[in-house]
Structures are given as C-alpha cells and as structure tokens.
Amino acid sequence: AYCETCANIANVMFNQRLNLLYGDSKYADIVETALYNSVLSGVSLDGKKYFYTNPLRISADLPYTLRWPKERTEYISCFCCPPNTLRTVCQAQNYAYTVTPNAVYCNLYGANTLATTLKETGKIGLVQETEYPWEGAVKLTVTEAPKPSKKKAFSLFLRVPDWCEKATLKVNGEPVQGTWKANTYAEVNRIWKKGDCVEWVMDMPVKLLEANPLAEEIRNQVVVKRGPLVYCLESMDIEGGHKIDNCLLYTSDAADD
C-alpha cells in the first residue's frame, strides 16, 4: 500500500472537519485510528527519521528500484511529510474536545486539561486522567463550573468507539444506567459543580480484522487490533530464525492479551 504520511494526515483533517459539521462519532473514530496508526508510523521514536510512504508490508528484494526507501530516513527529497507530521502531533490537542453553546464533546481520550467557555453556560474546566490507549478507564474531574447564580445544566458527551462493545459509567461514584452503542456518544446531562467526577470504562477486546478480499495483495491477511491500536508482526520480533511468511496466528491466540 502507498499510505503516504501526508495523505494520512489529510484523512485526519478531513474527518475532523466532518465531525465538526455533523457531530458524528464515526468521524472521530477515523481521526483516532489514523493518528495512532497511520500518522505516528511516519516518524521514528527518536523523532529524527521519517517515512514518506508507510508500507503495510515490505517484501524481499525486488528486481527493480523502489522510489522510496524501505526504512525511515533523516532526509526525504519531497520534504512535506516531516514538518506536516510535527504540525499534526502538536495540534492533535485541538481535536480532543469540541463544544457547542451548551455541551462538551470528548472525542479523543488521553491525559489532558480543558479550559473553555460555553456560550449558554459559562466557564468550564475539566481534567482527564487515563492510561489510554493501553487501558480503557477514563476519569474526568470538573475543575471549574458556572457560578451558583448562573448554574445551568449542560451535557458531557463521551465517545463510544467503534471497537467498544461494553462500557460502564459512574458520576460521583454512582452508576449511570444505560446501554451505549458503538459509534455513538454517551450523554450525561446535569447541573455540574466543581469536584464532580465521571468514571468512564470501556472494554478493550482483542479483535482480528480481515483485509478486504477485493484487494488482491492483502487477501486472506489479518491484523490484530486492541482498542485504537492496530498491531503488526515484524521480522525482528520472530525468534528462531523463522521467516515471516511462514507464521500463522490461531484465532484462539487473539483473545490472549
């Protein structure tokens, strides 16, 4: 696959704008998936080397020269991807929340703080604590709420990711009853006060995702996904000198974290 880093970033920006237009969590799902798996793959852990393309699979030597190297490199002749990657990582914080005159939408999970003003409610402050994307437990604490004379109810919307089949919600330790479907938002509407605490726990099942059979090169291939993270098998991870083409994954193994 081609998977240019800048094209993945464009996918993030496009779906972010669709989410702003329609408030549909499916667009935030795409933003999250692309950020974690298609944008971050474009830069090395030390931040010094970059991919122009992000190949899904690298095969043995070919009888012709590829335009782009198989490994990340410090210099790319078409130098759009490195600065675009850095810009996107730096501005990802702007995708975490969206607001309306009387609601806050939590689109991306991760440890952060929010300070904003709702047109119909007033100043709002939130602190989010979580080990996401490794764990599905998220804690949100209200650090600023409208003054007593101006208190009005407003809604906090929590994204239910497309991979989440079960979630639990508590407010100030009390369970909130409800069934939340994947690809939606869970809404909590109340008069909030400083110190209120929301505990949102999403199950993170391990899933096997099969490639589209209409794409010949990836037919009968799967990836392992847990939460928002998509995993792949790399040659350096294989012990005993076995070739990657000879490796199989039993479906029962996918359920073993």
What is the meaning of each model-derived region?
Residues 3-19, 82-91, 138-139:
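Well-ordered alpha-helical segments within folded domains of soluble proteins
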Residues 10-23, 40, 143-146:
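Well-ordered alpha-helical scaffold segments within catalytic/enzyme domains
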Residues 19-28, 161, 188:
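Carbohydrate-binding surfaces of carbohydrate-active enzymes
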Residues 29-37, 42-150, 179-181, 190-193, ...:
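C-terminal beta-rich recognition modules with glycine/proline-rich loops and embedded aromatic residues
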Residues 151-171:
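Beta-strand-rich binding/interaction modules
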Residues 170-173, 227:
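Short strand-turn-strand beta-turns centered on an Asx-Gly dipeptide
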Residues 174-178:
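Surface-exposed loop/edge segments in extracytoplasmic proteins
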